[in-house]
Amino acid sequence: MKIGIIGAMEPEVAHLIAAMTNATSQTIAGIEFIAGTLAGKDVVVTRSGIGKVAASIATTLLIEKYAPDAVINTGSAGGFVDTLAIGDIVISSEVRHHDVDVTAFGYEIGQMAQQPAAFIPAAHLVEAANKAIAQLGEVKAIEGLICTGDSFICDPVRTQAMLKNFPTMAACEMEGAAIAQVCHQFGVPFVVIRSLSDNANNDSPVDFDSYIVKAGYHSALMVMLLLEQLNPSAVK
């Protein structure tokens, strides 16, 4: 079993890379891919860069060059659930674009043309993540809708507009749906795991800078615990 792991920023992958053994590095199109062993599994970890285009490029290269059995997207997100605190975790129950609108042609809000409205993570990856939750200590984790767009959300007016379109949204970020869409195209199982760095409000820019390292660590810890729970035979 080989698992691809994608984070957008250095703090989101640093703890994973530091914990790897037998690591080798290859750079393609300016993106570094680090292959090795983590939590007893063969993995390839990459820092994609921020946003949907960067994430799509990295995911496509990862799948084409390394043929992973599954892809995990790790990192930070803005929170939309009152019961979660900064540092807590959202495991994707589904992933959607929040900044796509082709409703004029009969699609749902957030649904890209000729794509599903929601990208559904692999059941065996979500199951492994839920088993890992018990080992998180004081960090809380839930399953929920994660939405993606090419904007850092810190405007309460925009937040309310997003919640009107996606009332069950638990977190928003800038890469997950793009990664999920590429995985869907290639038929590769995926899951998105995000730790909250802010609460998508006026304080978000300050909170993000203050808590990105904490969020990156918690999300990386969740990924490593998930890897330990994965059954090597549970692929595709």
From Swiss-Prot:
Q: Which CDD domains does the annotation name?
A: MTAN
Catalytic activity, reaction form: S-adenosyl-L-homocysteine + H2O = S-(5-deoxy-D-ribos-5-yl)-L-homocysteine + adenine; S-methyl-5'-thioadenosine + H2O = 5-(methylsulfanyl)-D-ribose + adenine; 5'-deoxyadenosine + H2O = 5-deoxy-D-ribose + adenine
Q: Name one GO cellular component term.
A: cytosol
Signal peptide interval: none
Q: Which InterPro entries match?
A: MTA_SAH_Nsdase, Nucleoside_phosphorylase_d, Nucleoside_phosphorylase_sf
Q: Where does substrate bind?
A: G78, I153, M174, E175
- Which EC number(s) does UniProt give? 3.2.2.9
Name the keywords, alphabetized.
Amino-acid biosynthesis, Hydrolase, Methionine biosynthesis
One Pfam assignment: PNP_UDP_1
Which residues does the Swiss-Prot or TrEMBL record annotate as the active site? Answer: E12, D198
Record GO terms (molecular function): adenosylhomocysteine nucleosidase activity; methylthioadenosine nucleosidase activity
Checking SUPFAM superfamilies in the record gives:
Purine and uridine phosphorylases (SSF53167)
Query: Which GO BP terms apply?
Result: L-methionine salvage from methylthioadenosine; L-methionine salvage from S-adenosylmethionine; nucleoside catabolic process
Keyword Amino-acid biosynthesis, does the record have it? yes
Q: In which pathway does it act?
A: Amino-acid biosynthesis; L-methionine biosynthesis via salvage pathway; S-methyl-5-thio-alpha-D-ribose 1-phosphate from S-methyl-5'-thioadenosine (hydrolase route): step 1/2
Query: Record's family?
Result: Belongs to the PNP/UDP phosphorylase family. MtnN subfamily.
**HAMAP family in alphabetical order:** Salvage_MtnN
Q: What job does this protein perform?
A: Catalyzes the irreversible cleavage of the glycosidic bond in both 5'-methylthioadenosine (MTA) and S-adenosylhomocysteine (SAH/AdoHcy) to adenine and the corresponding thioribose, 5'-methylthioribose and S-ribosylhomocysteine, respectively. Also cleaves 5'-deoxyadenosine, a toxic by-product of radical S-adenosylmethionine (SAM) enzymes, into 5-deoxyribose and adenine.
- PANTHER family in the record: 5'-METHYLTHIOADENOSINE/S-ADENOSYLHOMOCYSTEINE NUCLEOSIDASE, 5'-METHYLTHIOADENOSINE_S-ADENOSYLHOMOCYSTEINE NUCLEOSIDASE
Protein name as catalogued: 5'-methylthioadenosine/S-adenosylhomocysteine nucleosidase
| Species per Swiss-Prot/TrEMBL record | Shewanella baltica (strain OS195)
Give the gene symbol. Answer: mtnN
